[in-house]
A protein has these predicted regions:
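Terminal accessory/targeting
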Residues: 1-3, 13-124, 136-281
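Active-site histidine-anchored catalytic micro-motif
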Residues: 127-129
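DG-centered beta-turn motif at the end of beta-strands
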Residues: 6-10
Length: 281
């Protein structure tokens, strides 16, 4: 069973309408919602009556923290400003780790509380740029879940088998990202085995082909997956095109990524998959 998933829903209204279009006219049947977005409530109204799986897109990258004023290490000038690499290093330096851990824990707790009205039967969790895989972040998240008795049914584990992409041209940086995330996934699964045993188990695709999730590549990928497997395939079809919204983006990486022509390519891939009856989904 495939979950065709779109991240970043709720970031901006028009951007979210583009994802909505991929639900109505494409194969998207799951979205991750941005818990710290000031536009989330408005964007959630667009989904009224839609049969779509919701996931919390825990966010330590884009926009302002919900714990503004209490997170000096992970934000500055009113917005998040902590890189993946820095948090990876911090994860293994004890005297720094504690400071970041406490701030991250408070922020994750507030983000989960902020979206409580949309999750009546338990939470599904992932994160922007997969930050939740970082040791200090995952440890904080696990403690938030445990200490608050939060019912969680799924946490995305962005672990991929590169053999699945044989013959598909992958960007070298994506290969590196996959190796890093696979290593972090093994660490988290090993440390929190009892926690993961309670979750829905899904295989994942979306980092190796990031920037290359075009129709032909996705069609090839689907043909290699056993239809009986529980599989999440990740897209980012939510382009940010409005000048006023582009100006509101706080992450330079997000600005480049969300304004890229690749967002339209992925949008079209979701629609072509729905239209092509030769592709078994």
């Amino acid at each position: 069973m495939f979950e065709f998933h779109a991240d970043d829903y709720g970031l901006f209204p028009e951007q979210s309408r583009r994802i909505l279009d991929c639900i109505e006219n494409g194969v998207i049947n799951g979205v991750s919602i941005m818990p710290n977005s000031p536009y989330l409530k408005e964007c959630m109204e667009f989904l009224s009556g839609k049969d779509v799986k919701l996931t919390v897109h825990l966010n330590l990258v884009e926009g302002a923290p919900l714990t503004a004023g209490a997170c000096e290490h992970i934000s500055g000038d009113g917005a998040f400003n902590i890189s993946f690499g820095k948090l990876l290093i911090v994860s293994y330096i004890p005297f720094l780790r504690k400071k970041y851990y406490e701030e991250i824990k408070r922020e994750l707790e507030e983000q989960i509380k902020a979206v409580a009205p949309y999750f009546k039967d338990g939470y599904r969790l992932d994160s922007h740029v997969h930050y939740h895989m970082l040791p200090v972040v995952f440890d904080a998240l696990a403690d938030v879940i445990r200490e608050n008795g939060i019912k969680v049914t799924y946490i995305r584990v962005p672990s991929e088998d590169l053999k699945l992409y044989k013959g598909i041209k992958l960007r070298p940086i994506n290969r590196v990202k996959v190796m890093v995330l696979n290593t972090l996934a093994r660490r988290n699964r090993r440390k929190y085995k009892e926690l993961f045993d309670k979750f829905e188990n899904k295989k994942f695709s979306g980092v190796a082909c990031s920037g290359e999730m075009n129709y032909e590549n996705v069609k090839t990928l689907i043909s290699r997956i056993d239809a009986s497997e529980n599989f999440e395939i990740l897209f980012h079809p939510g382009a940010v095109l409005e000048d006023e919204d582009i100006a509101r983006l706080t992450s330079k990486d997000d600005m480049a990524f969300l304004t890229s022509e690749n967002r339209h390519t992925e949008e079209m891939a979701t629609k072509m998959l729905k239209d092509n009856k030769d592709v078994e989904i």
